[in-house]
Amino acid sequence: MAFLKKSLLLVLFLGLVSLSICEEEKRENEDEEEQEDDEQSEMKRGMWSKIKEAGKAAAKAAAKAAGKAALDVVSGAIGEQ
């Protein structure tokens, strides 16, 4: 009977150690995945900020060109009178 108790305790102990190791590896994998997700979202944020800046620059250039064209039209109309 004592032999069975010792064997059972040994099996339980080894099972707990194995479970602990598995949980630790699982946590490490989750941390790695989270870090990869953070890097990807950071890259996306950087890409979107560049697109946003390019859009602002294009809008500014278009507005400037439209303003200049309108000024030329008004100047031409005033010059004709």
Swiss-Prot record:
Highest taxon of the lineage: Eukaryota
PTM-bearing positions, type Isoleucine amide: I78
Keyword Signal carried by entry: yes
Key words, A-Z: Amidation, Amphibian defense peptide, Antibiotic, Antimicrobial, Cleavage on pair of basic residues, Secreted, Signal
Protein location: Secreted
UniProt propeptide residues: 23-43, 79-81
Coiled coil: none
Tissue-wise expression: Expressed by the skin glands.
Secretion signal, residue range per the UniProt entry: 1-22
The keyword Endoplasmic reticulum belongs to this UniProt entry's keyword annotation: no
UniProt main location, coarse: secreted
Region of interest called Disordered, as start-end residue ranges on this chain: 24-46
Protein's GO biological process: defense response to bacterium
Biased composition (Acidic residues): 30-40
Pfam family, one: FSAP_sig_propep
Any one of the GO CC terms: extracellular region
Job of this protein: Has antibacterial activity against Gram-positive bacterium M.luteus NCT C2665 and against Gram-negative bacterium E.coli K12D31.
Family per similarity comment: Belongs to the frog skin active peptide (FSAP) family. Dermaseptin subfamily.
Protein name: Adenoregulin-related peptide
